[in-house]
């Protein structure tokens, strides 16, 4: 039977110094036999998804201590991708994921904590904490800050829903007046919480439910709603139960690697495809699987993408629905219920509540449950009041959205499309694959062919788009923006948003070895692997080359002969030390980012560190 890890620092005469320091934090003799549980918070005033988390760590800690544990809170960093977008700050976003994972490992192992409650929310924070949890493999529960309410404003005598992407598009559209742009900007992000669409943050928080590491409602219950408080209270109580089950009863089912099994990863990816989640989730699930030592690869994702339909459509793929609407329709469990009825899920999985998938659906699926309290929870709705306070309102929808033919969540029979919301494409310059969010691609451009316009930085591409140098029919190629080449694998939300603002959203394609924001829609193909900086063939594309995209058949092809590509590769290699680097890009890259780049793998490996370079 495993002993408490914390006993290393609390027992034995030779640990008198450690105990003296623990006493200085408020611990007493009575605490030294209890489990020490880390409350891993991520409060910051920089990020609306985290601005309300300051007091929530204390809330969890109080429940831990009431249940017989000792709570010790610390914070991780948290980068706001939206604020970092469109300038050099975006180079730091993806690398922050590794820093978060490492910092959690450092704190938890340095102080021998027994378990964790991870309070996350936004883009790289949930993945970073997830990677750390599976690396450490000690009991853990995730509880996120929750989604932002959708913005609303009146334009042309109509009330419309808004989010961050609308503000970006209208701000760049020369046809939009200053007053309208200002109105949209002021209305787009009304409350605390993660941005209101199915962007990366909300996608990842939904996936923690499917992985079994968070409670039902975690991905969709609004940050502002009073019902969300119960998730934090429950997490504090439940983590003590899980911790004692593992350390005192030798019950390994309480460990995250046994909850987030390969079957659970397959369920999470199935959910992601069905709900049209952010393409960034592919990166993060691949990275998390490696930490869990699970053989889960792009090949698995490709297989799932070919059989899973799209059952949910949310902003940015439509402006009709945001996360508050997903919640009203039953949230993540509502989507999982439809997938289960379609025979598309692994049922032999459990969650942190100890429930199997069938038990979870019976209790929490709004189409099955007889529990009025559960139905009431899924009626939790927005208040439409600007606030930075968690749990500040208790508004409810009059009814649930249980219309599986025309509502937000659909049954298999009434799916938005038989193909899911994400697809893996392969071709002669994406030998290891690339990713497209098909949920955001108009049917008219599922097959597309056009001449390449090649740029070696996001900045140059933006300048060309706004300067009118990109025209209908073009395929914009942005390279040397991968994990190693950027470094940092920038998101390309500004180029895709500006294509929309220039009226080219359905008339152009964009291909990159970088990545896209969860707010991206359109024919936007990212994660091209291998990346240019690793000798990938995307580095051989020249202006005017024809590129053919065939999403239905999962293909992407540079229409250049093998002989010509071989000649171009030979010429590239002849550049010596400058081979596979941008020819005309000036970019200041810090030592910290160079250190990240030196170990980074391409996107098909999750952009994690190359362990072979570290002897791993």
Curated annotation (Swiss-Prot):
Reaction equations catalysed: (2R)-2,3-dihydroxy-3-methylbutanoate = 3-methyl-2-oxobutanoate + H2O; (2R,3R)-2,3-dihydroxy-3-methylpentanoate = (S)-3-methyl-2-oxopentanoate + H2O
Modified residues (N6-carboxylysine): 124
EC number: 4.2.1.9
UniProt cofactor(s): [2Fe-2S] cluster; Mg(2+)
Entry keyword Cell membrane: no
Keywords: 2Fe-2S, Amino-acid biosynthesis, Branched-chain amino acid biosynthesis, Iron, Iron-sulfur, Lyase, Magnesium, Metal-binding
Keyword Metal-binding: yes
Class of this enzyme: lyase
Gene3D superfamilies: IlvD/EDD C-terminal domain-like
Catalytic residue positions: 517 (proton acceptor)
Binding positions for [2Fe-2S] cluster per the UniProt entry: 122, 195
InterPro entries: Dihydro-acid_dehy_C, DihydroxyA_deHydtase, DiOHA_6PGluconate_deHydtase_CS, ILV_EDD_C, ILV_EDD_N, IlvD/EDD_N
Cofactor binding mode and count: Binds 1 [2Fe-2S] cluster per subunit. This cluster acts as a Lewis acid cofactor.
Similarity-based family: Belongs to the IlvD/Edd family.
Subunit field text: Homodimer.
Function summary: Functions in the biosynthesis of branched-chain amino acids. Catalyzes the dehydration of (2R,3R)-2,3-dihydroxy-3-methylpentanoate (2,3-dihydroxy-3-methylvalerate) into 2-oxo-3-methylpentanoate (2-oxo-3-methylvalerate) and of (2R)-2,3-dihydroxy-3-methylbutanoate (2,3-dihydroxyisovalerate) into 2-oxo-3-methylbutanoate (2-oxoisovalerate), the penultimate precursor to L-isoleucine and L-valine, respectively.
Name of the featured protein: Dihydroxy-acid dehydratase
Species for this entry: Shigella dysenteriae serotype 1 (strain Sd197)
Gene: ilvD
């Amino acid at each position: 039977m495993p002993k408490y890890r914390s006993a290393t620092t609390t027992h034995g005469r030779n640990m008198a110094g450690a105990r003296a320091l623990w006493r200085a934090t408020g611990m007493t003799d009575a605490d030294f036999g209890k489990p020490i549980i880390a409350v891993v918070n991520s409060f910051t005033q920089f990020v609306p998804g985290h601005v309300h988390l300051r007091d929530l760590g204390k809330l969890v800690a109080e429940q831990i201590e009431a249940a017989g544990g000792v709570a010790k809170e610390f914070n991780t960093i948290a980068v706001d991708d939206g604020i970092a977008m469109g300038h050099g700050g975006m180079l730091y976003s993806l690398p922050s994921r590794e820093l978060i994972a490492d910092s959690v490992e450092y704190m938890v192992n340095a102080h021998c904590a027994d378990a964790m409650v991870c309070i996350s929310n936004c883009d790289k924070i949930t993945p970073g904490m997830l990677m750390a949890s599976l690396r450490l493999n000690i009991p853990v529960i995730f509880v996120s800050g929750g989604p932002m309410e959708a913005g609303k404003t009146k334009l042309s005598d109509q009330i419309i829903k808004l989010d961050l992407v609308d503000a970006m598009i209208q701000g760049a559209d020369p046809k939009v007046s200053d007053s309208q742009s200002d109105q949209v900007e002021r209305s787009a992000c009304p409350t605390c919480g993660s941005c209101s669409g199915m962007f990366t943050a909300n996608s990842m928080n939904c996936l923690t439910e499917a992985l079994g590491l968070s409670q039902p409602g975690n991905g969709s219950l609004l940050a502002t709603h009073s019902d969300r408080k119960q998730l934090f209270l429950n997490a504090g109580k439940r983590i003590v139960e899980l911790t004692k089950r593992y350390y005192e009863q030798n019950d390994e089912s309480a460990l995250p690697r046994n909850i987030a099994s390969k079957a659970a990863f397959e369920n999470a990816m199935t959910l992601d495809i069905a709900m049209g989640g952010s393409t960034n989730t592919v990166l993060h699930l691949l990275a998390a699987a490696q930490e869990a030592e699970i053989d889960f690869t792009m090949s698995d994702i490709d297989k799932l993408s070919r059989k899973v339909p799209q059952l949910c459509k949310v902003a940015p793929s439509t402006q009709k629905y945001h996360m508050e609407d997903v919640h009203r329709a039953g949230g993540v469990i509502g989507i999982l219920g439809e997938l289960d009825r379609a025979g598309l899920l692994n049922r032999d999985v459990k969650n942190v509540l100890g429930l199997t998938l069938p038990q979870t659906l019976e209790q929490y699926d709004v189409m099955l449950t007889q529990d009025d309290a559960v139905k009431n929870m899924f009626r939790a709705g927005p208040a439409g009041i600007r606030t930075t306070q968690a749990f500040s309102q208790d508004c409810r929808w009059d009814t649930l959205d249980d219309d599986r033919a025309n509502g937000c969540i659909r049954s298999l029979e009434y799916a938005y499309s038989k193909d899911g919301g994400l697809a893996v494409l392969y071709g002669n310059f994406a030998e290891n694959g690339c990713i497209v969010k098909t949920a955001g691609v108009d049917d008219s451009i599922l097959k597309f062919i056009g001449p390449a316009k090649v740029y070696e930085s996001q900045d140059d591409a933006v300048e060309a788009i706004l300067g009118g140098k990109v025209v209908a029919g073009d395929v914009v190629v942005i390279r040397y923006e991968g994990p190693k080449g950027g470094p940092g694998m920038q998101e390309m939300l500004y180029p895709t948003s500006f294509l929309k603002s220039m009226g080219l959203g359905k008339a152009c394609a964009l291909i990159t070895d970088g990545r896209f924001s969860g707010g991206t829609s359109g024919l936007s193909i990212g994660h091209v692997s291998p990346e240019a900086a690793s000798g990938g063939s995307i580095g051989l594309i020249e202006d005017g080359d024809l590129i053919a995209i065939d999403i239905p058949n999962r293909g992407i092809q540079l229409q250049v002969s093998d002989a010509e590509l071989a000649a171009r590769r030979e010429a590239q290699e002849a550049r010596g030390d400058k081979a596979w680097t941008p020819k005309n890009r000036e970019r200041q890259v810090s030592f910290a980012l160079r250190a990240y780049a030196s170990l980074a793998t391409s996107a098909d490996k999750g952009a994690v560190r190359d362990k072979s370079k570290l002897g791993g």
